[in-house]
């Protein structure tokens, strides 16, 4: 049976990770190591200036006072590490599409698994709310079972977004590319009860492209979106242009 390390960024008590654990334990041996609080937006951050403390909960999950990346690193490259065949992160309670992946702790946990040489999956709900986690859990469990029977040998992270609906209403699956969002709305300015100036992030931007092969379009049309993400962030198609430009500056 495949051995899975399961983490997330919404925290070890979040309903998404509980639902995903229930689905995955039917097809794999699952170990949960997750943050002790919500770490949404943590991206690939590490805890470098404080010790990491791990607590085993009554349900067998491990709670960590660190980031999603810390949790996966603990589970794969520390004295508490065990054999792992696959890293899975989620279920995030909202989409991780387009530019979201740069900020997402959900995607970052999967990226850390890939960085440690393991296949990895990040899974998020295509809508905001706490319903239909069972839909996403079933989708991922089916993919994991297929991966065990027929290994997918790609040097990538699979970023999966699942429509916010019941399983029977899913229209299918599309392999997609990342879309783009408009810039976020202006930060909100306020003052705390003591009169000190404070700021809050404004709402995220809406999607900026209606291309047919993006993650946004797939979710909008009722399809599961699977986007392969690479650790190599080199903009390869621009290297010749940059080389020519540098030559002209001599």
Curated annotation (Swiss-Prot):
GO terms for molecular function: 3'-nucleotidase activity; 5'-nucleotidase activity; exopolyphosphatase activity; metal ion binding; nucleotide binding. A divalent metal cation binds at residues 9-10, 40, 92. Keywords: Cytoplasm, Hydrolase, Metal-binding, Nucleotide-binding. Binds 1 divalent metal cation per subunit. Its cofactor is a divalent metal cation. Disulfide bonds: none annotated. The keyword Transmembrane helix does not apply. It is found in: Cytoplasm. InterPro entries: SurE (IPR030048), SurE-like_Pase/nucleotidase (IPR002828), SurE-like_sf (IPR036523). It catalyses: a ribonucleoside 5'-phosphate + H2O = a ribonucleoside + phosphate. One of its GO terms (cellular component) is cytoplasm. Its EC number is 3.1.3.5. Pfam families: SurE. Its main location: cytoplasm. Nucleotidase that shows phosphatase activity on nucleoside 5'-monophosphates. NCBIfam families: PRK00346.1-3, PRK00346.1-4, surE. Belongs to the SurE nucleotidase family. This is 5'-nucleotidase SurE. It comes from Idiomarina loihiensis (strain ATCC BAA-735 / DSM 15497 / L2-TR). The lineage of its organism: Bacteria, Pseudomonadati, Pseudomonadota, Gammaproteobacteria, Alteromonadales.
